[in-house]
Amino acid sequence: MSTPDLAVLYEHPTWQQPLFDALDKRGVDYLAYDVKSAAFDLTEDVQASIIFNQLSPSAYVRGNGHAVPFALALLNHFESNGARVLNGASAFRLELDKIAQIRLMRDLGMDYPWTIAFNNVEALRDHEATLNFPAILKPNQGGSGARMAEVNSLNELKCLLEEDPSLWQPDPVLLLQEKLDHDPSKQGIVRLEFLDGELLYAMRVVGVSGFNLCPSIDCNPEGDEEGGCAVPSATPTSDPQFLPYPEVPAEVVEDASRLFRATGFDVGALEYLITSDERRVFYDINANSNLRRSVGLAMGFDPFDKVAEYLERQISS
C-alpha cells in the first residue's frame, strides 16, 4: 500500500468536508484520519509525508473527548519519528490551554482579559478583593463557546456549578474572566484567519448574544441552510452575522501577526474586540480554524482552496 502525500487528522467530519472537497478537486492524495476510533502501532512508520492536525478542543461536547488525548499522543508519535506535522503537538497543547494563551499575550506585552483560574469555588474566597462582576465563566479547554456562562456574583457561580457539574468538563480547571464591555450588535468581535503566518482574511462577527462564535456553517448556518451544532445555547441568541472586514487596521494586523508567530501555529485564527473604553483586547487563540467560505468569496477567493493550495506547497517542498 502506497503512502499518501497528506494525512488530515480530524474528529468533526462536517467541519472538514469543505477542505476534503478542495483537496479532491486538486487531486491531492490524502488520508482522512478520523481519530474518534483509531489505533496506532508504535513500531509503524509515519503514515503520510505531511500530517495536518485539525482536531478541535470542543470534541468532548460531541461525546468525543477521548479523541483529544489520543490525537496528542499520535502527534507526539509522528513528530518523534521525524514527520512534518502542521499544527503539531506543541500547537495543540497551546490550543487546549487558555491559561497558556493568556500567559502568552501577557508575555508579549499585549492587553488581555483579567483572568483567574480555579479548581474549587471556595478557593476563590481568598481572591474576593480582586474579583469583578459580572464575569465570564469558561473552561480552560474551551471551544465553540461550550460550558460558558455569565455570572454576577461568587454565590451565583457556586450555585451554577452545583446545579450543573458538567461545567467542570473536560478537565477540572475553570476560568473566571473579565467581561469585556462592548457593543455586540454593532461593534461585535473581529476574527483574523492566518495561513502560513500571513493574514488570509479578517471578518467581523456582529449580532451575537450568546457565546458560540464558531464560523462553521454547521454551527451558524447561512440563509436557509440547516446546522447541527452540538453546543446548545444557554440563553436566547440572535443570529450572528459574519461580515468581511478588509479594512482591518494595519497596526492590528501587525500585533496579531506577532501573536500568531509566537503561537507556533501553521494555520489558525485570533479574535479581538474593542471595548467601550477603547481597549483593543485579544482574547482567543484557535488552531483548528473553521473558515467561512462566504467571507472569503466576498474578498475574491475560496478560503478552503487557499488551504488546499498551501498543503500542496508543503507536500512539494
Where are each of the predicted segments found?
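Short glycine-rich anion-binding loops that position phosphate/pyrophosphate groups of nucleotides
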Residues: 56-60, 141-142, 288
